[in-house]
Amino acid sequence: MVVPESFQLDQEILLDAGAQLHRLKMYPYFDVAHYLLMIIEVRDDLGSAASIFSRKHPLSCWLSSMLMCFADAFLANFLLGEPVIAPFKRHDDIILATIIWYLVFYAPFDGIYKIAKITPVKCVLAVMKEVKRAYKVSHGVSHAAKLYPNSYIVQVLVGTAKGAGSGIVRTLEQLVRGVWLPTHNELLRPSFATKACVVAASVLALEKSGTYLTAPHDLVYLVIVGFFVYFKLSAVILHVTDPFAPIENLFCAIFMGGIWDAVSRALAASRDRRAAGAHSNENGSSISTPEKKDQ
């Protein structure tokens, strides 16, 4: 099938779009969307006790919110052996995040919180947050590649930490609020955001090496942003929780012992049926023998 030239996407247009997207400044608009959604997650995790907790324990509430807002930088610095407190060196970011924290928890009639929960507003915030997520993953991989140019695993770990650090730091954030749930952490039950960041960081690490992936960086970055935005909107609008689940189930069934476990269960069930059949035959013969004697 021949596609008309009017419908063909020029590669230069895609590269220019990727370059423009890559050069977007995150401060303040994209940072506002990120801070707002992170602090809303803290409030949602508190549930109905959010209002009482924020008034009784404002310091704990503020600290847990800041941990979520800057979790990516905390975790990446920890992995690279850099000062963990470094995210607090920019007072502009702290002031902006604190203002948003105050509006989410203390605005009259919960106005900011309720507005952010409206679906169109939530979609816009989600798109902006995913653009920032792609930006952080890209910069995390680039920073790690400068320090460890021959280590793909370090680049992927740092890129994932920059993009999905909030899920991993959540256990510490809950501990600050007096909640200890060690069985509910991102390493045991990784969210789709963490899995997507692993995939994106792996692609960017391969693209950085130039050995296995030779596509232009701006084009790769544009595809990653589209990947993040598409699945985030699918989760918000269509409630698609984890698109990777079918692939994971198939992979585990083939390579993680799923097939052999199923065969073992089938053999065990077959043995149980044979044993039950033999036992019923023995009971039938023992019952028929006394009847013959009575006759």
UniProtKB/Swiss-Prot annotation:
Q: Where is this region: Disordered?
A: 274-295
Record-linked Pfam families:
TRIC (PF05197)
Q: Which UniProt keywords apply?
A: Endoplasmic reticulum, Ion channel, Ion transport, Membrane, Potassium, Potassium channel, Potassium transport, Transmembrane, Transmembrane helix, Transport
The record's Gene Ontology cellular component field reads: endoplasmic reticulum membrane
Q: Which InterPro entries match?
A: TRIC_channel
Q: Where in the cell is it found?
A: Endoplasmic reticulum membrane
Substituting residue 133 to L results in: Abolishes PIP2 binding, impairs trimerization, reduces potassium current and calcium-sensitivity
> Is Protein transport there in the keyword field?
no
- Provide the membrane-side ranges marked Cytoplasmic in the record: 46-56, 108-119, 178-188, 240-295
Which positions, given as ranges, span the membrane? 28-45, 57-80, 90-107, 120-148, 151-177, 189-210, 216-239
Record's keyword annotation contains Ion transport: yes
Q: How does it sit in the membrane?
A: Multi-pass membrane protein
Q: Which residues lie on this side of the membrane: Lumenal?
A: 1-27, 81-89, 149-150, 211-215
Q: What is the effect of changing residue 180 to A?
A: Abolishes calcium-sensitivity
One function term, GO molecular function aspect? identical protein binding
Q: Where does a 1,2-diacyl-sn-glycero-3-phospho-(1D-myo-inositol-4,5-bisphosphate) bind?
A: 129, 133, 166
Q: Which family does it belong to?
A: Belongs to the TMEM38 family.
Q: Report quaternary structure and partners.
A: Homotrimer; trimerization probably requires binding to phosphatidylinositol 4,5-bisphosphate (PIP2).
Q: What does this protein do?
A: Potassium channel that mediates transmembrane potassium transport. Might be required for maintenance of rapid intracellular calcium release. May act as a counter-ion channel that functions in synchronization with calcium release from intracellular stores. Binds phosphatidylinositol 4,5-bisphosphate (PIP2).
Q: Which PANTHER family match?
A: GH25683P, TRIMERIC INTRACELLULAR CATION CHANNEL
UniProt-recorded name of the protein = Trimeric intracellular cation channel type 1B.1
Name its species.
Caenorhabditis elegans
Q: Its gene?
A: tric-1B.1
